[in-house]
Amino acid sequence: MSFQEVWEKEPMKKPRIQKITVNFGVGEAGDRLTIGAKVIEELTGQSPVRTLAKQTNPAYGIRKKLPIGLKVTLRGKNAEEFLKNAFTAFKACGKVLYASSFDQVGNFSFGVPEHIDFPGQKYDPSVGIYGMDVCVTFDKAGYRVKSRKLKRSHIPKKHLVTKDEAIEYIQTKFDTEVVRE
C-alpha cells in the first residue's frame, strides 16, 4: 500500500509542514545586516529576528553577542508559499535535492545561494546578493501532545514522520524531484 493510499484512508497519518526556518548568515553587523533585513522581509513578508555571535573572533572583527545574522520562522500558508518560491529559486541555480538532506524524522534543509533567483527579484547593485539556508520541519496531526503544558505525553514511533514519507510528500505536493543515492 502506497503512502497516498494510507493518507487518504487515515488522514491523521499524513505529514504536514510544521514550520520553515529561513536563516541569513550575514557574518557582520552594520549596513549589510540592515539591508539583509529588508531583503528577507520582502521575501517572506515577516520581520526577521537578529541572531547574535556566540563567541569572539578577532580575525573577522566579530565580538560576542554582536548581531551577525537574521532568521525568520514561517508557519501555515506563508510557509507553503515561501517553500514553492524557494524550490523555484533552488532549481533555477541548477541544484537538486538529495535524499541525504533528510534526517530520520523527515526534516530537511537546503541552501539558496542567491536571493535574486526568487520569482520577482531583480539584482540591485546597492543591495548585493544574499544567500540563505531553508530548514523544513515536519509533523503530523496529534504532535501537540508532546509540547503542551498539561498532560504532556510522548509520540509513539509508529506516528513519527519517516524519511520516506517526507520525501513522498515533497515530491507530490511541490513537484520536486528528490535524488536517491
From Swiss-Prot:
UniProt entry tagged with the keyword RNA-binding: yes
GO MF annotation, one: structural constituent of ribosome
The entry's keywords: Ribonucleoprotein, Ribosomal protein, RNA-binding, rRNA-binding, tRNA-binding
Top-rank taxon: Archaea
GO CC term (a single one): ribosome
UniProt function note: This is one of the proteins that bind and probably mediate the attachment of the 5S RNA into the large ribosomal subunit, where it forms part of the central protuberance. In the 70S ribosome it contacts protein S13 of the 30S subunit (bridge B1b), connecting the 2 subunits; this bridge is implicated in subunit movement. May contact the P site tRNA; the 5S rRNA and some of its associated proteins might help stabilize positioning of ribosome-bound tRNAs.
Subunit structure comment from the entry: Part of the 50S ribosomal subunit; contacts the 5S rRNA and probably tRNA. Forms a bridge to the 30S subunit in the 70S ribosome.
Name listed for the protein in its UniProt record: Large ribosomal subunit protein uL5
